[in-house]
């Protein structure tokens, strides 16, 4: 069971809504993933009416909606977008996302921290997308963010856990949930994140652009469950040396 702020989730896999060939395929994949929290970019939905092709089926499915501020470049723009989302969707949950460079889509740490502090004070449940910076993640936690979402690699790159060393530090020091977001490309990446101690992963591109998004979503669901179960089972320690699993000479001595 995963708790973030006032909500609990059975699934440790969060999903997105971008890049799917159709809203029907999107919903089939989300159902197959078992995800109970789904992000959506405010720039992609019609906030004036709930019969939007993306929004309507998500509301009907009963998943927790996590609007994100993708596309904004400053703290001020993010705060404005957050209030629009809260008014339109009736949720104070927000994935804070500020990336001014459209080529790399890397989060701006200064603007993110500034916006996070203000939004928390204004009653939002803030989940910030951020770089895998242990110092920044601790600062975001200190200003009241409900979780931190450090990247594994650049958004949509499918490179996996390129920031593993920093993620390990973030996980070790965090007192709020850590959700690895961005760069996860295959189910084994997700399993590794859960094994190393992450509380959840957010996956969008790897599922949406797969040849078979529905089966890929199932694969991610199984991988996340496997990674979590492996961690809870207490993996053996690593060693530079070999350790025999059975006596090497006992049977020889016994027969001598």
From Swiss-Prot:
It is an enzyme of class 2 (transferase). Pfam families: ThiG. It catalyses: [ThiS sulfur-carrier protein]-C-terminal-Gly-aminoethanethioate + 2-iminoacetate + 1-deoxy-D-xylulose 5-phosphate = [ThiS sulfur-carrier protein]-C-terminal Gly-Gly + 2-[(2R,5Z)-2-carboxy-4-methylthiazol-5(2H)-ylidene]ethyl phosphate + 2 H2O + H(+). Its main location: cytoplasm. The active site is at 95 (schiff-base intermediate with dxp). It comes from the Bacteria. GO terms for cellular component: cytoplasm. Disulfide bonds: none annotated. Its EC number is 2.8.1.10. CDD domains: ThiG (cd04728). Pathway: Cofactor biosynthesis; thiamine diphosphate biosynthesis. GO terms for biological process: thiamine diphosphate biosynthetic process. Coiled coil: none annotated. GO terms for molecular function: thiazole synthase activity. Keywords: Cytoplasm, Schiff base, Thiamine biosynthesis, Transferase. Signal peptide: none annotated. It is found in: Cytoplasm. PANTHER family: THIAZOLE SYNTHASE (PTHR34266:SF2). Catalyzes the rearrangement of 1-deoxy-D-xylulose 5-phosphate (DXP) to produce the thiazole phosphate moiety of thiamine. Sulfur is provided by the thiocarboxylate moiety of the carrier protein ThiS. In vitro, sulfur can be provided by H(2)S. Homotetramer. Forms heterodimers with either ThiH or ThiS. Belongs to the ThiG family. This is Thiazole synthase. It comes from Escherichia coli O7:K1 (strain IAI39 / ExPEC).
């Amino acid at each position: 069971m995963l708790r973030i702020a006032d909500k609990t989730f059975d699934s440790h896999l969060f999903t997105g809504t971008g890049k799917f060939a159709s809203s029907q395929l999107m919903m089939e994949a989300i159902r197959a993933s078992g995800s109970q929290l789904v992000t959506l970019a405010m720039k992609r939905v019609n906030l004036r009416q709930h019969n939007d092709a993306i929004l309507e089926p998500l509301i009907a499915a009963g998943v927790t909606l996590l609007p994100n501020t993708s596309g904004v470049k400053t703290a001020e723009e993010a705060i404005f977008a957050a209030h629009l989302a809260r008014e339109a969707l009736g949720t104070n949950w927000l994935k804070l996302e500020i990336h001014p460079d459209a080529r790399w889509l890397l989060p701006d740490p200064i603007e993110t921290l500034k916006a996070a502090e203000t939004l928390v004070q204004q009653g939002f449940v803030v989940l910030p997308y951020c770089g895998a910076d242990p110092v920044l993640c601790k600062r975001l936690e200190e200003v009241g963010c409900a979780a931190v979402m450090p990247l594994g690699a650049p958004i949509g790159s499918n490179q996996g856990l390129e920031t593993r060393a920093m993620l390990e530090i973030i996980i070790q020091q965090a007192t709020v949930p850590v959700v690895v977001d961005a760069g996860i490309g295959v189910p084994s990446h997700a399993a590794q994140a859960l094994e190393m101690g992450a509380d959840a992963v957010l996956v969008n591109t790897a599922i949406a652009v797969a040849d078979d998004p529905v089966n890929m979503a199932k694969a991610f669901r199984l991988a996340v469950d496997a990674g979590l179960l492996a961690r809870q089972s207490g993996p053996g320690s690593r060693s530079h040396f070999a350790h025999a699993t059975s006596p090497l000479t006992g049977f020889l001595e016994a027969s001598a």
